[in-house]
């Protein structure tokens, strides 16, 4: 026996609603899982100790780093002088 209250478009609409609901829930769940995994407070076994395969460069003192000299001095830009 067929249900007289069910027309042919109603099951399709119900399937569409359920499908959209599942897509939204699954997309949110995957994002939450990735964020928890990426920003967890506990360090994972892989990240606990850093062992470089190649030797790292020596640390440079602050006095050894010289700032680059500016080619244009401050205040000599004609676009900034026009007001």
UniProtKB/Swiss-Prot annotation:
GO biological process: cell-cell signaling involved in cell fate commitment; maintenance of root meristem identity; phloem development; regulation of cell differentiation
Name by which UniProt lists this protein: CLAVATA3/ESR (CLE)-related protein 20
The UniProt record lists the keyword Membrane: no
GO cellular component, one term: apoplast
Family: Belongs to the CLV3/ESR signal peptide family.
Superkingdom assignment: Eukaryota
GO function terms (MF aspect): receptor serine/threonine kinase binding
Region forming the signal peptide: 1-29
Cysteine disulfide partners in this protein: none
Gene from which the chain derives: CLE20
Keywords associated with the record: Developmental protein, Differentiation, Secreted, Signal
Record-annotated membrane-spanning stretches: none
């Amino acid at each position: 026996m067929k249900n007289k209250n069910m027309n042919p478009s109603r099951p399709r609409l119900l399937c569409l609603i359920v499908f959209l609901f599942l897509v939204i829930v699954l997309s949110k769940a995957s994002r939450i899982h990735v964020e928890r995994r990426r920003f967890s407070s506990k360090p994972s076994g892989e990240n606990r100790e850093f062992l470089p395969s190649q030797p790292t460069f020596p640390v440079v003192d602050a006095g050894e780093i010289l700032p680059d000299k500016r080619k244009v001095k401050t205040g000599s830009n004609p676009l900034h002088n026009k007001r």
